[in-house]
Design a protein with these regions (language model features):
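Active-site anion-handling motifs in enzyme catalytic cores
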Residues: 1-294
């Protein structure tokens, strides 16, 4: 749902009239009328489809270049494309720095989800209460590695032990939350089935944002749960355990300065009644709004 939360943040800024949602993975195939397009978010699973069509007039804001396809998106043709549409607003420090190294005028814009307005999603005027937990353990859940027969066998051998470790940590986490003087609500940003349409995705994103707006504390390991919560004024605890891979570290660079960021061991030491409020994101929030609405 995270991609659609980012999309919803942009729609909230530009308005819902006369908008068109384009497929991020097929921007090169767009062949309709010339269209102004805000290009933000994670790029991309299909780098062979980059750069976009000439009929797309891009505004880059909150753009993330994923390290797994970095070589493809930094080829000469792509660099010329970035150069012709400078400056490039980057969601993270990593993306900004890699583009600057290539001579592209780039700046750190932060993420569009930091602009989300709580008032747009509160169903009632009652005071927000309770803790919302979204995917706090998503990164710790053991999985099987299907990349090769050897890796699959190795992951199968390790799986039972990782599963036991995961279950024990989850049990301790749940017991800790039960002892808190808060009502606890739990949700998941990962859908059980693929999202079939943009309308469905936006509906799910809206419902998730409404759930976030009702609470006062967020506990998560999902960046697009943490940032909207921050924007809405919630106190945020971000569990970074399991996010050691370079892909995760790069996409989080700069963003984790916005909230209380801990590993699981340190989480149990936190007083959830006394989490500091953070406002480091606000300077970038204003710049995003000004850039999109200019």
């Amino acid at each position: 749902i995270g991609d659609y939360i980012q999309t919803k943040a942009v729609i909230d800024l530009v308005g819902s009239k006369n908008i068109k949602i384009l497929d991020r993975e097929n921007l090169d195939k767009y062949n309709d009328n010339v269209i102004k397009t805000i290009i933000n978010g994670w790029f991309m699973e299909s780098p062979e489809n980059w750069p976009p069509s000439e009929k797309i007039k891009p505004l880059f804001i909150s753009f993330h270049l994923n390290p797994s396809i970095e070589a493809e998106l930094l080829k000469d043709e792509s660099l010329q494309y970035f150069k012709s549409h400078e400056p490039i607003g980057c969601r993270d420090i990593y993306t900004r720095d890699i583009l600057l190294e290539k001579g592209i005028n780039a700046f750190y814009s932060s993420c569009v989800t930091t602009t989300i307005d709580r008032n747009n999603y509160l169903k009632s005027k009652t005071q927000a209460k309770g803790i919302i937990v979204i995917g706090a353990f998503d990164r710790l859940k053991p999985t099987l590695d299907y990349k090769s027969s050897f890796k699959l066998l190795l992951s199968l051998l390790k799986y039972p032990f990782k599963k036991i470790d995961y279950s024990l940590k989850l049990l301790k986490f749940n017991r800790h939350l039960k002892n808190q003087d808060f009502k606890i609500k739990r949700y998941n940003q990962l859908t059980k089935k693929p999202i079939k349409s943009h309308n469905e995705g936006l509906k799910l994103a809206t419902e998730m944002l409404q759930k976030i707006a009702e609470n006062e504390v967020m506990i998560t390991s999902r960046i697009h749960a943490a940032l909207p919560a921050l924007a809405m004024g919630l106190k945020v605890v971000f569990i970074d355990q399991g996010l050691d891979h370079g892909n995760h570290k790069h996409r989080l660079s700069g963003l984790t300065n916005y909230f209380t960021c801990v590993n699981l061991k340190d989480f149990f030491m936190i007083n959830l009644d006394n989490i500091p409020e953070m406002d480091k994101h606000k300077v970038h929030k204003k710049k995003i709004k000004d850039t999109i609405n200019k």
